[in-house]
From Swiss-Prot:
Keyword tRNA-binding: no
Keyword Mitochondrion tagged: no
GO BP term (any one): response to oxidative stress
Full protein name: Alkyl hydroperoxide reductase AhpD
Enzyme category, top tier: oxidoreductase
Residues annotated as catalytic: C130, C133
EC number of this enzyme: 1.11.1.28
Subunit structure: Homotrimer.
Amino acid sequence: MSVENLKEALPEYAKDLKLNLGSITRTTELNEEQLWGTLLASAAATRNTQVLTEIGAEAADTLSAEAYHAALGAASVMAMNNVFYRGRGFLDGKYDDLRAGLRMNIIGNPGVEKANFELWCFAVSAINGCPDCVASHEHTLREAGVSRETIQEALKAAAIISGVAQAIVASQTLATAG
């Protein structure tokens, strides 16, 4: 199970995604933990079994157990937070004075370097489409001294994984329908 398997699973019309997937795994903008944590959190955020299985297997060989669990924790807590804060954002500030009241202890104590966890939350928030969360995590990353290039590379990784998941679903769905 691997990124290579995902590349092979992509249909011909997703050749750009295949090339981008190969390129992102060779990035020099992200260190190994940042890259594989971003890929794993993003794969979990896509809710695509094949993508998560393939990325998860390769990430398990690369990440420490703490980083592996933190990346999945980022995807999980952002699944909740992105819905809450995106939904609240639709309400024109009418609920901004109310406390969220949601437990999110992992954000304060992720078990890995805080900036890496924030990077994974940022990537997942982009996939989940929460502008408030994307902006908040980007701000936290910049305050921590993370470069714009590193942040953009994580965004690219999230976009690629999201596109791969969509292409695989489309291909599999049409193959079983036809």
